[in-house]
């Protein structure tokens, strides 16, 4: 008997996979517990529709992320922060600060989860910051950390 898994099943497969199982295992264990449904033509067409929608959504997400990355790369980002005479910052610049700067510059929302900062920035200068956007889109920007004039 062929079944479509509705949930991950240990030693059998992952959600959405079509598996061949014995009739007893399918009818007496998987189907009653809501772990699988019998692989009929209508269920297979539902699965195909769901997979197509998922694929379209992923493509849309990737396209939006690539467009956002293109807009980000067209800009030069500067952040003015309080720092000592030696260039050491009073505090640190975090991924949340960088995300806030990007969001402000672009006039859109930008999550701190998209900023891949290994460690907080603690000195003035130019830094390469990696970005990981949804849809597995990766890129990097250069951000200039400058001492603010106000003391």
Curated annotation (Swiss-Prot):
<dbReference type="Pfam" id="PF03948">
    <property type="entry name" value="Ribosomal_L9_C"/>
</dbReference>
<keyword id="KW-0689">Ribosomal protein</keyword>
<comment type="function">
    <text>Binds to the 23S rRNA.</text>
</comment>
<comment type="similarity">
    <text>Belongs to the bacterial ribosomal protein bL9 family.</text>
</comment>
<dbReference type="GO" id="GO:0005840">
    <property type="term" value="C:ribosome"/>
</dbReference>
<dbReference type="GO" id="GO:1990904">
    <property type="term" value="C:ribonucleoprotein complex"/>
</dbReference>
<dbReference type="GO" id="GO:0003735">
    <property type="term" value="F:structural constituent of ribosome"/>
</dbReference>
<dbReference type="InterPro" id="IPR036791">
    <property type="entry name" value="Ribosomal_bL9_C_sf"/>
</dbReference>
<dbReference type="InterPro" id="IPR020070">
    <property type="entry name" value="Ribosomal_bL9_N"/>
</dbReference>
<dbReference type="InterPro" id="IPR036935">
    <property type="entry name" value="Ribosomal_bL9_N_sf"/>
</dbReference>
<dbReference type="InterPro" id="IPR000244">
    <property type="entry name" value="Ribosomal_bL9"/>
</dbReference>
<dbReference type="InterPro" id="IPR009027">
    <property type="entry name" value="Ribosomal_bL9/RNase_H1_N"/>
</dbReference>
<keyword id="KW-0687">Ribonucleoprotein</keyword>
<dbReference type="InterPro" id="IPR020069">
    <property type="entry name" value="Ribosomal_bL9_C"/>
</dbReference>
<protein>
    <recommendedName>
        <fullName>Large ribosomal subunit protein bL9</fullName>
    </recommendedName>
</protein>
<dbReference type="Pfam" id="PF01281">
    <property type="entry name" value="Ribosomal_L9_N"/>
</dbReference>
<keyword id="KW-0699">rRNA-binding</keyword>
<keyword id="KW-0694">RNA-binding</keyword>
<dbReference type="InterPro" id="IPR020594">
    <property type="entry name" value="Ribosomal_bL9_bac/chp"/>
</dbReference>
<dbReference type="GO" id="GO:0019843">
    <property type="term" value="F:rRNA binding"/>
</dbReference>
<dbReference type="GO" id="GO:0006412">
    <property type="term" value="P:translation"/>
</dbReference>
């Amino acid at each position: 008997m062929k079944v479509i898994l509705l949930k991950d099943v240990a030693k059998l497969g992952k959600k959405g996979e079509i598996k061949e199982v014995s009739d007893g295992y399918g009818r007496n264990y998987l189907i009653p517990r809501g772990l699988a449904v019998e692989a009929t033509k209508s269920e297979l067409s539902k699965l195909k529709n769901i997979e197509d929608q998922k694929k379209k959504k992923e493509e849309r997400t990737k396209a939006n992320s690539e467009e956002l990355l293109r807009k980000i790369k067209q800009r030069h980002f500067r952040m003015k922060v309080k720092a000592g005479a030696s260039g050491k910052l009073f505090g640190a610049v975090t991924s949340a600060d960088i995300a806030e700067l990007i969001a402000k510059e672009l006039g859109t929302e930008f999550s701190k989860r998209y900023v891949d900062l290994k460690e907080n920035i603690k000195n003035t200068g130019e830094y390469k910051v990696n970005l990981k956007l949804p849809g597995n889109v990766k890129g990097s920007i250069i951000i200039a950390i400058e001492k603010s004039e106000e003391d």
